[in-house]
């Protein structure tokens, strides 16, 4: 037999704690205050992408570019009491990778070039996933895209951000339960210029 005990005082304390500050996820993690919500992000996994990165990725995926384009997303992942939080604060154009979905691959040479750029322009940031722009192909993924993700970006905290600039659609995917799962939304955050 399982006995469930309800402590009214603990529940009240927990509710007050949750109401204090929605931007304070845990003692060590403070979320950006100046944000824009896209979609309906899940409370257990949050993705925050810096506005600069969004602008850069939009430039890469600009309308008129008929070829698939890609970039490597950089940032950090944090664990908190409220769940996992991924911050994307940089991106490196993957010019040296041909994004033809039938032949795409991240070679050792491509990764060497990417890591050299990361070290030079974004020291301290980690690879958090990748960006793919496919004009006119929607934000749906196929087996080849999923295979590329699993082979090159293993782990639960790695993301795929895919756009279709023709339809002005975008979506984040994360690897969950053995497959890439489309996320319900994300946040764009704005840093103050110093």
Tell me the role of every PLM-derived stretch.
Residues 1-129, 135-194:
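N-terminal beta-strand/alpha-helix entry module and adjacent surface
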């Amino acid at each position: 037999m399982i006995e469930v005990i309800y402590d009214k005082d603990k529940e009240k304390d927990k509710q007050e704690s949750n109401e204090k500050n929605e931007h304070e996820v845990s003692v060590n993690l403070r979320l950006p205050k100046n944000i824009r919500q896209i979609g309906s992000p899940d409370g257990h996994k949050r993705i925050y992408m810096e506005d600069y990165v969004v602008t850069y990725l939009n430039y890469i995926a600009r309308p008129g570019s008929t070829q698939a384009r890609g970039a490597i997303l950089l940032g950090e992942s944090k664990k908190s009491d409220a769940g996992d939080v991924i911050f994307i604060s940089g991106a490196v154009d993957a010019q040296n990778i041909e994004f033809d979905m039938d032949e795409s691959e991240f070679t050792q040479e491509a990764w060497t070039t990417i890591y050299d750029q990361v070290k030079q322009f974004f020291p301290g940031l980690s690879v958090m996933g990748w960006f793919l722009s496919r004009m006119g192909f929607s934000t749906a993924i196929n087996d080849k895209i999923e295979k590329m993700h699993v082979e090159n970006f293993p782990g639960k905290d790695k993301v795929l951000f895919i756009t279709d600039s023709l339809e002005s659609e975008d979506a984040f995917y994360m690897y969950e339960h053995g497959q890439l799962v489309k996320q319900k939304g994300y946040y764009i955050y704005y840093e103050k210029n110093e």
